[in-house]
């Protein structure tokens, strides 16, 4: 991929996505469940660009949404309503009504209160709501605490006994149709053992429900498959799928999974231009035009993305300590223009001297990059570009100042 040409053509900061890589990841995951009925529902929150959603819908993907906005995005991008799932711990009435009116595949419920509210709304609309219940198996996903969701101390889902009670209520309700069961224990999971253990617990509950004449059709294992940012080892897809399927013996269910980061994470790159270097005593900084409002993961999660620089036609990667003196690489922080000490994209990285206009490329930026960006410091958000079959095309233009203030200007009087 010619990052220098893309930066010259579209400017920086810039997100670039490799659509061919996304297709490869989707097909690899889908094929790992080839012996079973399965549905891969892409987690829209990871990267919600309409062109990304349209591309994945064309491959046959379903969509896991956590707001009515994401449901509407998926529909706008061409998704079939019967391949959309609405999740999320706090759904408003208008979101539940929209899901009911558009007859999506199922609504993942997270509490008894939510079930009662949905039942009331379905009755008002004269509908029967297809539901799944998110079961919290009390499993430690061994990931960052901000993205761990499968423990009793987390806000997500209900315990096994509460789930049974909810399913029995739904079975006897004319306005609820229990069709699925759901669990999701966390994100960026690189050890599949907790996922398989959670599947075992939920599968046993599914057998109990089937015995009680509750026809569970969809077994949703959630998402969370991790990717390589640095030195991690990526889970083996065959072992992941077979570990789940081994627990489903005798169960006639469609397996649903909800990957987000796994599909788009390593398909994305964040390009930012060097403004200048500066030194505070012995501390070296490379100041770039990208910032925490563009890519907040390093500041928010202490995430460490691999980076490299492009200078004078050369690709300059981080190097090991023994190479530093020979190549004139020195430790530095890559920081942005925002008025926060937490505004950094990388810390303590070994890079060579860089000049204004050189590029810094941050890898693994396709998930939770642009999706979590903001207009902090009244900065317009970056443009997004897709590359497919060697061709590049704009999929979101750069925000202008007028875009940023558009919703406020009319109130100036």
What spans do the regions from the language model cover?
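Short beta-strand segments
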Residues: 43, 130-136, 182-184, 220-222, ...
